[in-house]
Amino acid sequence: HEMRFVQRVRCWEYRQQPSIVRLVRPTRPDKARRLGYKAKQGFVVYRVRVRRGGRKRPVPKVLCMVNPQTRELLNSSSRGATVLLLRS
């Protein structure tokens, strides 16, 4: 449980800092060495905040500028293929 507490405190500290921070040495040296880090000149370590979640898909502009009757014709796409529903 002690490691979990340390992790929570670190997360809080990291949130108070800017999104990109240069570090003197890696927080987890074992993991850094597995990724190719060596403690000698020429290696720099940064902590970078990464946004969580999936890919943000851009909203098509067409839906903003279409009149409401036409908007009914446009249906959300399924598996990337756009489906048009025509009123009769």
From Swiss-Prot:
Protein name: Large ribosomal subunit protein eL15
Organism from which the protein derives: Brassica napus
One of the record's GO cellular component terms: ribosome
GO molecular function, one term: structural constituent of ribosome
One example of a Gene Ontology biological process annotation: translation
Matching InterPro entries: Rbsml_eL15_core_dom_sf (IPR024794), Ribosomal_eL15 (IPR000439), Ribosomal_eL15_CS (IPR020925), Ribosomal_uL23/eL15/eS24_sf (IPR012678)
Family statement drawn from the similarity comment of this UniProt entry: Belongs to the eukaryotic ribosomal protein eL15 family.
Taxon lineage: Eukaryota, Viridiplantae, Streptophyta, Embryophyta, Tracheophyta
One family name in Pfam for this protein: Ribosomal_L15e
Key words, A-Z: Ribonucleoprotein, Ribosomal protein
Highest taxon above the source species: Eukaryota
Gene3D superfamilies tied to this protein: Ribosomal protein l15e
